[in-house]
């Protein structure tokens, strides 16, 4: 009978659900393995075929490790707050809570249909008050430690998006929001921020202790951007002595080459330093660049722009006057928001100096045409007074000493990383548990009153004040304490990154009402052994989660410094036209359709066989057909037309499959460990091909093969396991072992030559000696044919390789 995927997959999914097959116990007498997927945002579109790739990888590892005797934690949940639900609610009038619940139901149905071995008793949802109670609790601990603060911050403000909201730098493209294309402006606004910068050094240094792709580590290092240099203070001509411009430079040794200064247009001193003659030009320039994101402003390929303020800085090392400009390539958020420009030795400064005809002063010796380019190489210092003749590092050290002695600067470590802007002007997010009182005091909502619940409302229209829609709910916003003091709740909500920064901890103990998770359980399960998800989260989610985890470690809440020991980024499944799948391109493949037509096991097998897990590969319907045919081929190998185990599966073992079976167990085990699933599948295909060539199939090998296959094709394997006479699920069957001695052939093929030319071959015992080899060669028909009529002069036998008959 043909393999009926619909009946068989439904049968085993029901069995797993009813028997809670994948329920995880918090036992400590077994080794643990924690396999985690980046939990999805439950969008209205549901899963696409890209989602199951990563989920299948973690599921294979989870099933594999269970059979190896590990206690496996493999959970799933929902990152369910976020902008799309709120936008949909505004557009349609639906409540985001109901919309999200409906989407989760659909996602869960789809995920169950793919046979993933999640423990659904541990499901978490970031929008559940019992979950975000602890998100709020973490915020309160950050606040108590001085790591959550409110300040006037320059933000990307999109006034027409959701009635006005802040978006991150990563969400801005060409002065517009990535989602929706709304205009973005840089404006100062009171925002909550988290002091991630306090953890900058640890976030860099501890990358050495985790098994992550090197490119992700490098992205995090670059994002944090640690650099060592000097803080240098410049007086301003015509200004009081206490008016100083502070500059951070990694090359203080080039101070003699500074020929102008540049401030970010948003720098606090711009207004004070702008002369009346330059005021209009400065104002116009600031308006012009207001909609540019930081990424656009620092684009190396863009044309340099700027305006002179009319003021001059004083170079502390030689007293020279340096014109002070503003330009958008200097960011208020990086360093001090001011630079000393050394155009002879910096490409951006050189371009700017050339455009505005500013002096270019070489201070490092090198063969260079300064009419054409800056010299950015190393060399001895020239035109540099007391550092003349010195190489780079000695000159830096000497200059820093000089600055310190003259109270004009000191050594400093700087970071590109900025504090994390933590507030959003949206409804659908975790309320920030803060009250602002009429007397100016700000307090936290008492811990015993958490969670501060997000109030239900039908009015999601913008407040009109730049605040979130929560500002419209008077009876929620306005509070009075026991002394009659009036206050207002914080109306901004947390960003979507909040709930995803600690969810992996809640899976360990999801129903705990007294703590975010029990410490002893965390000690058993932490850290996550395998984390699989997209590389696009390199510098946001993954950095934020590491920051929160380190903070919780410092509090004594978690036992490890790092949350995720091993990270794997699955590649992208592209459309069959090699483009990214998207609704607009019309190339999205719905997994529901594939499961219905071919079955979940076919989809799982195909996605793992497409290529290396990390590679981005186009979808191929032909490849899908091939995977489906192989599933049926495995079925036919073992099961006859009457749905019974074939008679050729027997206890008899004639040894014909011994070597290939042991090779297959060894190779598949090693390839699973290394997550080379495509290569493991290739080896299983080789075994099936060999199995079709023999008359008898030893049941011990067939059962072993079914175990090897089960992590990838669990429904097929459960059915075969059952038909082979087993009452229990294959889930906890013992992983097969191999015999190293069986991997070595007893026989070897040797070459038979006449006068050095190959004339024949022979299969011989591996340990056959020289005398026997000579006799065998001389008795070979082909050798006799080529030596007929000739005299054999010599026979050279090399055991295990060849016999050469010399004749003439």
Curated annotation (Swiss-Prot):
For this protein, the Enzyme Commission number is: 6.1.1.4
Q: What is the top EC class of this enzyme, as a single word?
A: ligase
CDD domains linked: Anticodon_Ia_Leu_BEm, LeuRS_core
GO biological process, any: leucyl-tRNA aminoacylation
Compartment(s) where it occurs, according to its Swiss-Prot or TrEMBL record: Cytoplasm
Alphabetically sorted, this entry's keywords are: Aminoacyl-tRNA synthetase, ATP-binding, Cytoplasm, Ligase, Nucleotide-binding, Protein biosynthesis
Residue numbers binding ATP:
583
**Listed GO CC annotations:** cytosol
Motif interval(s): 'HIGH' region: 40-51
Q: Which InterPro entries match?
A: aa-tRNA-synth_I_CS, aa-tRNA-synth_Ia, Leu-tRNA-ligase, Leu_tRNA-synth_edit, M/V/L/I-tRNA-synth_anticd-bd, Methionyl/Leucyl_tRNA_Synth, Rossmann-like_a/b/a_fold, tRNAsynth_Ia_anticodon-bd
Q: Which GO terms describe its molecular function?
A: aminoacyl-tRNA deacylase activity; ATP binding; leucine-tRNA ligase activity
Motif 'KMSKS' region is found at 580-584
Q: Which PROSITE patterns does the protein's record reference?
A: AA_TRNA_LIGASE_I
> According to its UniProt record, which reaction does this protein catalyse?
tRNA(Leu) + L-leucine + ATP = L-leucyl-tRNA(Leu) + AMP + diphosphate
Q: Which SUPFAM superfamilies match?
A: Anticodon-binding domain of a subclass of class I aminoacyl-tRNA synthetases, Nucleotidylyl transferase, ValRS/IleRS/LeuRS editing domain
* UniProt similarity note: Belongs to the class-I aminoacyl-tRNA synthetase family.
Query: What's the protein here called?
Result: Leucine--tRNA ligase
Q: Which organism is it from?
A: Lactiplantibacillus plantarum (strain ATCC BAA-793 / NCIMB 8826 / WCFS1)
Which gene codes for it? Answer: leuS
């Amino acid at each position: 009978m043909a393999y009926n995927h619909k009946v068989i997959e439904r049968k085993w999914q029901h069995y797993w659900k009813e028997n809670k097959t994948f329920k995880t116990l918090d036992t400590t007498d077994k080794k643990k393995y924690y396999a985690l997927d980046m939990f999805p945002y439950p969008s209205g579109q549901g899963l696409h075929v890209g989602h199951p790739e990563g989920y299948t990888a973690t599921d294979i590892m989870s099933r594999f490790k269970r059979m190896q005797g590990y206690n496996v934690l493999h959970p799933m949940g929902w990152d369910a707050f976020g902008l799309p639900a709120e936008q949909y609610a505004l557009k349609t009038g639906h409540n985001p809570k109901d919309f999200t619940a409906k989407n989760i139901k659909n996602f869960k149905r789809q995920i169950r249909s793919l046979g993933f071995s999640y423990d659904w008793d541990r499901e978490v949802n970031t929008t559940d008050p019992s979950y975000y109670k602890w998100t709020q609790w973490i915020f309160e601990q950050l606040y108590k430690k001085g790591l959550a603060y409110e300040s006037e911050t320059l933000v990307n403000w999109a006034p027409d998006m959701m009635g006005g909201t802040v978006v991150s730098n990563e969400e801005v493209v060409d002065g517009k929001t990535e989602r929706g294309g709304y205009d973005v402006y840089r404006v100062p606004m009171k925002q909550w921020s988290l002091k991630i910068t306090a953890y900058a050094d640890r976030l860099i240094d501890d990358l050495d202790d985790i098994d992550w792709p090197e490119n992700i580590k490098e992205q995090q290092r670059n994002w944090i951007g640690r650099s060592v240099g000097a803080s240098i203070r410049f007086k301003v001509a015509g200004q009081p002595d206490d008016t100083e411009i502070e500059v951070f430079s990694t090359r203080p040794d080039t101070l003699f080459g500074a020929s102008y200064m540049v401030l970010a247009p948003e720098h606090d001193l711009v207004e004070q330093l702008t002369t009346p003659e330059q005021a209009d030009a400065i104002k116009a320039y600031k308006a012009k660049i207001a909609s540019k994101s930081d990424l656009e402003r620092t684009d190396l390929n863009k044309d340099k722009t700027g305006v002179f303020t009319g003021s001059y800085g004083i170079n502390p090392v030689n007293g020279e006057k340096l014109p002070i400009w503003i330009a958008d390539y200097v960011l208020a958020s990086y360093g001090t928001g001011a630079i000393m420009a050394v155009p002879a030795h910096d490409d951006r400064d050189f371009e700017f100096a050339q455009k505005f005809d500013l002096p270019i002063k070489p201070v490092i010796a090198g063969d260079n045409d300064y009419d054409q380019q800056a010299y950015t190489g190393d060399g001895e210092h020239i035109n540099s007074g007391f550092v003349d003749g010195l190489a780079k590092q000695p000159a830096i050290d000497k200059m820093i000493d000089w600055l310190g002695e003259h109270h004009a600067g000191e050594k400093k470590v700087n970071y590109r990383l900025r504090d994390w802007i933590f507030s959003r002007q949206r409804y659908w997010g975790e309320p920030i548990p803060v009250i602002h009182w009429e007397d100016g005091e700000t307090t936290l909502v008492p811990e015993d009153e958490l969670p501060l619940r997000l109030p239900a409302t039908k009015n999601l229209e913008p407040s009109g004040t730049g605040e979130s829609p929560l500002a419209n709910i008077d009876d929620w916003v306005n509070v009075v304490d026991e002394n009659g003091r009036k206050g207002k709740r914080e109306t901004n909500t947390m960003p979507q990154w909040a709930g995803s920064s600690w969810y992996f901890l809640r899976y360990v103990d999801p129903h705990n009402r007294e703590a975010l998770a029990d410490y002893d359980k965390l000690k058993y399960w932490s850290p996550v052994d395998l984390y699989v998800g997209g590389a696009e989260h390199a510098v946001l989610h993954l950095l934020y989660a590491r920051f929160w985890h380190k903070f919780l470690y410092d509090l004594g809440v978690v036992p490890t410094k790092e949350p995720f020991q091993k990270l794997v980024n699955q590649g992208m499944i592209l459309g069959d036209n090699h483009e990214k799948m998207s609704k607009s391109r019309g190339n999205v493949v719905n997994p529901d359709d594939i499961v219905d037509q071919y079955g979940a096991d076919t989809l799982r097998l195909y996605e793992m066989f497409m290529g290396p897990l990390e590679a981005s590969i186009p979808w191929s319907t032909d490849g899908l057909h091939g995977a489906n045919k192989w599933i049926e081929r495995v079925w036919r190998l073992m099961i006859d037309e009457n749905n019974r185990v074939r008679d050729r599966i027997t206890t008899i073992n004639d040894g014909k499959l011994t070597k290939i079976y042991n090779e297959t167990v060894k190779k598949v085990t090693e390839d699973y460990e290394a997550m080379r699933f495509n290569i493991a599948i290739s080896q299983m295909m080789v075994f099936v091909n060999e199995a079709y060539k023999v008359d008898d199939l030893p049941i011990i090998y067939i059962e072993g093969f079914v175990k090897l296959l089960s992590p990838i094709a669990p429904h097929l394997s459960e059915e075969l396991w059952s038909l082979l006479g087993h009452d229990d699920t294959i889930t906890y069957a013992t992983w097969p072992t191999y015999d190293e001695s069986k991997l070595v052939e007893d026989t070897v093929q040797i070459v038979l030559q006449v006068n050095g030319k190959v004339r024949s071959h022979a299969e011989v015992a591996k340990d056959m000696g020289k005398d026997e080899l000579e006799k065998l060669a001389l008795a070979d028909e082909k050798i006799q044919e080529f030596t007929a009529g000739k005299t054999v002069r010599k026979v050279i036998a090399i055991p295990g390789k060849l016999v050469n008959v010399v004749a003439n």
